[in-house]
């Protein structure tokens, strides 16, 4: 069977995602990654084993398992939606598994040295509207553990000054949830709003020439953080701030995963368990190193 899909479908393949019940950012990511699968189909044709063979094709690449799975998942979502819409007669993804991926984080969060460099740099900044903006952003990342996308989604109205909390639109959530703010976060946000005269709409707006005045994007925020990290010789990603936040809570509340989850807003305790295990491994490693401190050659 050489063709289960009319050739016209692939000319406008992005339209298949229009009726998916997903966030727009997810839809954009799907459309970004799908052309690789489309090129594969155009080259090798489409039959009941295409998805399985595509997985074998991805396995032969030098990409990480995480990247391979991202491409495989997009192809799976695409094919399942094609089947749901009646564009192909069968679900060719059935019984084809994803690549097995370790649940442990490959990248570490900011460590104590990184935090010292960053906080000293922030504390030495002069009092300007731009610097107040940076301090407000980092207070939400370091002290509240917000994800980048959550920071970018915030509106001025989400800051409940009276009760000192934020209403955060979390990852994979349909409604905003209240997040209690630490005193320093409240102070930083108040100062930022006052000095920048932000009254309504997006809490953080872009200062770049092409996006001036528009809501700060996740990509834009990641770039801001990356530039600062590079300047301070912090070899970590922007998401490392959330890793730091979660690890710090677990260090001070060891084993209290349910309590920690209330603040990190992880939907899965399993993910927190991975963080907790990493902390325990680091603690044990220090003991192992000290055990062999007298052995040298």
Task: Indicate residue ranges for each PLM-predicted region.
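C-terminal catalytic core of tyrosine-transesterase DNA break-rejoin enzymes
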Residues: 139, 143, 242-267, 273, ...
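DNA/chromatin major-groove-contacting recognition/catalytic segments
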Residues: 179-180, 262, 274-297
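Flexible interdomain linker/hinge and immediately adjacent N-terminus
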Residues: 88-119, 169, 207-212
């Amino acid at each position: 069977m050489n063709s289960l899909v009319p050739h016209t479908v692939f000319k406008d393949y992005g339209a298949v995602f229009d009726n998916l019940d997903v966030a727009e950012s997810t839809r954009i990511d799907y459309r970004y990654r799908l052309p690789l699968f489309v090129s594969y189909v155009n080259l090798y044709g489409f039959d009941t084993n295409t998805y399985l063979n595509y997985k074998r094709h991805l396995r032969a690449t030098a990409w990480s398992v995480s990247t391979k799975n991202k491409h495989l998942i997009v192809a799976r979502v695409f094919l399942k939606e094609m089947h749901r819409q009646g564009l192909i007669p069968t679900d060719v993804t059935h019984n084809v598994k994803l690549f097995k991926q370790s649940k442990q984080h490959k990248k570490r969060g900011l460590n104590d040295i990184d935090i010292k460099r960053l906080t000293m740099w922030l504390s030495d900044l002069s009092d300007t509207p731009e610097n107040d903006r940076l301090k407000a952003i980092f207070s939400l990342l370091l002290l509240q553990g917000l994800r980048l996308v959550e920071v970018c989604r915030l509106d001025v109205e989400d800051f409940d000054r009276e009760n000192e909390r934020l209403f955060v639109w979390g990852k994979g959530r349909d409604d905003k949830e209240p997040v209690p703010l630490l005193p320093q976060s409240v102070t930083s946000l108040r100062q930022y709003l006052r000095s920048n005269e932000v009254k309504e709409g997006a809490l953080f707006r872009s200062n770049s020439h092409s996006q001036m005045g528009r809501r700060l994007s996740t990509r834009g925020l990641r770039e801001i953080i990356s530039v600062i990290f590079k300047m301070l010789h912090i070899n970590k990603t922007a998401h490392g701030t959330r890793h730091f936040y979660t690890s710090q809570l677990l260090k001070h509340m060891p084993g209290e995963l349910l309590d920690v989850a209330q603040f990190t807003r992880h939907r899965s305790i399993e993910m927190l368990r991975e963080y907790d295990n990493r902390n325990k491994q680091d603690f044990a490693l220090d003991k192992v190193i000290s055990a062999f401190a007298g052995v040298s050659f």
